[in-house]
């Protein structure tokens, strides 16, 4: 009974936290599944430069930045560049700044810069001394999960996933923390990825199948978007059985939201097979229309 009360309290708190925020249901433009890959590919990040789209995966063998080949009926990947960080890797996010990729490694919760041309890699020497919660006290598997960049201001945004969740702003010129904060009135208590687009920060709240549009100057949510109708059916997700939501990669390009799924090797659900003709255990990418700002 106590457990039931706690669950009900959580959902009530989540609902109350979003009161006053209109949630826009996103329109599906396309959905495609990865093909021609031997083994497991746990998609964890997506970004682009010009017409080229790049993705990453979070297993120890995925020491590559991959080029995504978007095709009529599916998508494939091919290694663009390989890197050696000199440590164990669990790459959970990517963002681009000119010819440099910034990667977050949840294995040690550090940020790395990788040259897209030759794979030369270096760790950013960020002073973490200002953190309210020292990294050594972070829960395992609850560290950096999202990264985004404001190229004009040269500000890097890092998302700590959960327990507790917060965003860290980094001045890339000085490699120091500008500020650290959480965002109120969100759909859930996690961030799975970030993307900076036209002055706003977008964050995936994967356990609520929701995206928050955040004003980085006020730290407030200005719009909520939901992909629940296109990514679930009566509680059944694209991949089952799973405990958590699995959307872990976020990109916005030319007014289109790209969401990638890290399915952890889980097979697609009956819902995904029937509605989208998906199959097997490889990840999908979903394209959704970004509504006009209100």
Label each residue range with its predicted role.
Residues 21-294:
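Sequence/structural signature of beta-propeller domains
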């Amino acid at each position: 009974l106590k457990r039931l009360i706690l669950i009900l309290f959580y959902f009530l708190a989540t609902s109350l936290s979003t009161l006053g925020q209109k949630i826009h249901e996103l329109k599906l433009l396309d959905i495609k599944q990865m093909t021609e890959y031997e083994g497991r590919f746990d998609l964890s990040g997506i970004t682009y430069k010009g017409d080229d789209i790049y993705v990453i995966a979070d297993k120890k063998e995925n020491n590559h930045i991959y080029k995504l080949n978007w095709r009529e009926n599916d998508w494939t990947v091919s290694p663009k560049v390989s890197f050696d960080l000199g440590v164990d890797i669990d790459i959970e996010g990517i963002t681009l700044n000119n010819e440099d990729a910034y990667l977050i490694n949840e294995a040690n919760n550090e940020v790395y810069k990788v040259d897209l041309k030759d794979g030369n890699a270096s760790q950013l020497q960020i002073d973490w001394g200002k953190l309210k919660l020292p990294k050594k006290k972070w829960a395992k598997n609850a560290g950096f999960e999202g990264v985004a960049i404001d190229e004009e201001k040269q500000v890097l945004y890092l998302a700590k996933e959960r327990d507790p969740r917060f965003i860290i702003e980094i001045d890339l010129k000085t490699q120091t923390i500008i500020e650290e904060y959480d965002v109120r009135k969100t759909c859930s208590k996690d961030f799975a990825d970030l993307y900076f687009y036209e002055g706003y920060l977008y964050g995936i709240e994967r356990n609520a199948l929701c995206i928050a549009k955040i004003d980085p100057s006020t730290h407030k949510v200005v719009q909520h978007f939901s992909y629940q109708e296109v990514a679930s059916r009566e509680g059944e997700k694209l991949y089952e059985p799973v405990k958590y939501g699995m959307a872990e990669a976020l990109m916005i390009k030319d007014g289109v939201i790209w969401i990638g799924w890290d399915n952890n090797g889980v097979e697609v659900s009956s819902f995904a097979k029937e509605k989208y003709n998906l199959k097997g255990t490889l990840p999908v990418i979903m394209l959704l229309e970004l509504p006009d700002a209100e």
